[in-house]
């Protein structure tokens, strides 16, 4: 909690500024005027007579305010919490500590209102307003404006006849020849105490009083200026500046700090250079993610925020209902579905066609089997509190801020909970197709002693570099040990019957063909997890709304359409050539001239093309772990030791199993239960050993 800003607290800063305004080292900041083009004496006289009072006030305010800003940012015990004081000091030093938001005279620049409005609107971006401490900021600005009244008490600067005569005398004297800018010269004379160049006796007499009044305001000016800029940069950081993803090697901590500082510097400079309020707003509007889903989620979050503010919805004890039923629960169901916009008809106790349509819409947007009936799964979903639904939407918005997509114009996005992948090009979604992702089998991690998803499709980004037609499947060691070796121990002819080849070093691969789990094409984006997109010989899984059946790779529903699209965009698609390759059946690699970014990400909430909010399955509990981390911490387990085994060839070329002690096991004469203990983990469907 920030300390209360008051005259007493600001006193420390004001004291630190006491000796800065009138000494020979006074900073001139932005008040210093550039030398104008040479003018006639008459033009100079007119300029000085009309502009000098305004320029003098600006010069004075800039001098003491600039010094106060520098002093505040160097204080170890500053009266307010400036999170980025070191960075701000270097940024303001680059502009001689000239303020961006205050004018040093109790007034605010055109940049303030858009920044304040944006900070107050942070809740619309699912960012906590309290993070930017707007009450303290508002208090600082209010105090600054109150201190501005001190200058008003001194009264406006009005040149006397004696001052005007002195100006005319100066212009008529030889002293004008030594000054590139007469206004600048007289201003320096007043600040640096050179009476020989300050022929304004009446003004000189009131100068000290005006300096004291400006100094009293300077502390409040510095606090308001630094606090507002600090919060503006904090907002920029929270939106996207924190995101350090790069396709290159992950930056070191030092390099990451440099990148963030560079981004914040760019925002600082853009705000300082913005010529008017609309330009400031343009700078601020460019900070949030520009990806389409983010913009669609904002009004959805606002709608659910309003539902929560009105008390949310009540839980309904469910029962199976279908069209034609009459029951008091039907009215409650209609009212409940109406709250989220799924039902728009009258509230009564008849389960009519309109309600059936609404139930089907709810099922379709919540990854259920669509049958229009209210079963146990339906009620469990419907009774999730509104607060939790809002939290899911807001977390999804945060995940979009964390997205690795960046400024890519052409990319493939795999959204794991959505069980779909999309191809985007120049802001347009060219393709959307179903996928199967890693299953939800859980094992005990021996390192953390907590349950984890053994086959979860990893979140990552990499460049797709090539496609392979008629691919071999090189079986990963884990799948070999956990599934193929047990199959071999049960049936000594299993490898031969299923087109599996074994090399002398124990590696195993499946030949191209109808039984190959990779189907007819795979799409390679080299990555540490060795996962990829591919066709499949098990197409029945695509009929299910929740499609978590693989060992981590992503099975594509329309692989040949994706292949045609990618090769066409790459300028090398030839239908007849592809057909001949499939007919030959030999493995055939095709490199992409321009690699395509592939982003595998995790968004539980999605807005569909009709504008409905889709709440998808949190299949790997990643959202749960962030929203309710205590549940994840409680999932402790004891690792189960399993025998390590590998394949070797016998002297006559038959596959043999070698256990951890080096013993050879003949698959044709072994009971698998004697070698491998049964696992109680829920794995893929029987016989589905594909990637």
Cite the ranges covered by each PLM segment:
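Bacterial N-terminal signal peptides that target proteins for export
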Residues: 1-6
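C-terminal motif of bacterial Sec signal peptides marking the signal peptidase cleavage site
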Residues: 13-16
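Well-ordered beta-sheet/strand-loop patches within structured domains
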Residues: 18-84, 88, 93, 233-234, ...
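Zn2+-dependent metallopeptidase catalytic domains
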Residues: 21, 26-186, 191, 196-206
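Generic structural signal for hydrophobic core residues of well-folded globular domains
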Residues: 119, 123, 235-240, 382, ...
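Short acidic, glycine/serine/threonine-rich helix-capping segments at coil-helix boundaries
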Residues: 129-133, 138-141, 145, 152-165, ...
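Short, hydrophobic/amphipathic alpha-helical patches that form generic packing surfaces
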Residues: 223-242
């Amino acid at each position: 909690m920030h300390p209360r800003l008051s005259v007493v607290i600001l006193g420390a800063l004001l004291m630190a500024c006491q000796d800065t305004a009138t000494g020979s080292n006074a900073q001139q900041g932005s008040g210093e005027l550039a030398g104008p083009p040479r003018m006639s004496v008459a033009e100079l006289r007119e300029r000085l007579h009309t502009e000098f009072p305004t320029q003098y006030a600006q010069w004075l305010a800039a001098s003491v305010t600039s010094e106060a800003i520098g002093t505040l940012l160097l204080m170890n015990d500053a009266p307010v919490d400036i999170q980025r004081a070191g960075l701000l000091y270097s940024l303001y030093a680059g502009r001689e500590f000239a303020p961006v938001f205050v004018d040093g005279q109790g007034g605010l620049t055109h940049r303030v209102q858009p920044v304040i409005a944006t900070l107050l609107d942070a809740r619309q971006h699912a960012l906590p307003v309290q993070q930017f401490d707007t009450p303290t900021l508002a208090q600082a600005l209010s105090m600054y404006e109150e201190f501005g009244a001190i200058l008003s008490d001194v009264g406006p600067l009005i040149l006397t006849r004696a001052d005007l005569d002195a100006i005319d005398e100066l212009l008529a004297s030889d002293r004008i020849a030594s000054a590139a800018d007469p206004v600048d010269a007289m201003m320096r004379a007043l600040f640096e105490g050179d009476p020989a160049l300050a022929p304004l006796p009446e003004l000189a007499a009131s100068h000290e009083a005006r300096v004291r009044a400006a100094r009293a305001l300077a502390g409040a000016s510095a606090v308001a200026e630094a606090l507002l800029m600090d919060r503006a940069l904090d907002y920029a950081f929270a939106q996207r500046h924190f995101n350090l993803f790069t396709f290159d090697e992950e930056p070191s901590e030092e390099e990451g700090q440099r990148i963030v500082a560079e981004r914040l510097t760019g925002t600082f400079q853009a705000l300082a250079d913005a010529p008017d309020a609309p330009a400031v707003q343009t700078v601020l509007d460019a900070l949030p993610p520009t990806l389409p889903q983010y913009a669609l989620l904002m009004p959805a979050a606002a709608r659910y925020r309003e539902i929560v503010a009105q008390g949310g919805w009540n839980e309904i004890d469910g029962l199976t209902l279908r069209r034609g039923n009459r029951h008091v629960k039907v009215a409650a169901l209609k009212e409940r579905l109406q709250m989220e916009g799924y039902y728009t008809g009258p509230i009564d106790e008849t389960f009519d066609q309109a309600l059936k349509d609404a139930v089907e819409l709810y099922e379709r947007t919540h990854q259920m089997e669509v049958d229009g009936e209210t079963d146990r799964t339906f009620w469990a979903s419907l009774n999730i509190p509104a607060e939790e639904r809002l939290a899911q939407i807001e977390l999804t918005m945060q995940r979009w801020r964390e997205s690795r997509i960046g400024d890519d114009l052409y990319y493939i996005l795999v959204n794991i909970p959505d069980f779909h992948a999309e191809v985007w090009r120049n802001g347009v979604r060219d393709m959307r197709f179903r996928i199967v992702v890693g299953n939800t089998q859980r094992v005990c991690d021996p390192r953390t002693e907590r349950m984890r998803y053994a086959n979860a499709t990893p979140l990552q980004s990499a460049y797709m570099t090539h496609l392979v037609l008629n691919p071999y499947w090189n079986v990963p060691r884990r799948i070999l040990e956990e599934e193929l070796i047990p199959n071999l121990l049960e049936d000594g002819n299993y490898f031969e019957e299923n087109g599996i080849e074994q090399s002398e070093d124990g590696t195993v691969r499946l030949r191209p063909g109808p039984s190959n789990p990779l189907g007819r094409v795979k799409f390679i984006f080299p990555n540490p997890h060795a996962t990829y997109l591919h066709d499949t010989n098990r197409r029945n899984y695509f009929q299910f709304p929740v499609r978590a059946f693989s060992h981590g790779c992503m099975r594509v529903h329309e692989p040949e359409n994706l292949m045609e699209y990618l090769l066409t965009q790459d300028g090398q698609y030839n239908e007849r050539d592809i057909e001949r390759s499939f007919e030959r059946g030999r493995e055939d690699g095709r490199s992409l001239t321009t690699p395509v970014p592939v982003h595998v990400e995790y968004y539980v909430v999605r807005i569909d093309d009709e504008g409905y909010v889709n709440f998808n399955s949190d299949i790997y509990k990643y959202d749960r772990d962030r929203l309710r981390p205590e549940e994840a911490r409680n999932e402790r387990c004891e690792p189960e030791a399993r025998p390590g085994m590998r394949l070797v060839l016998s002297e006559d070329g038959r596959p043999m199993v070698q256990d951890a002690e080096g013993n050879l096991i003949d698959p044709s004469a072994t009971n698998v239960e004697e070698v491998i203990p049964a696992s109680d983990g829920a794995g893929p469907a029987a016989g589905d050993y594909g990637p």
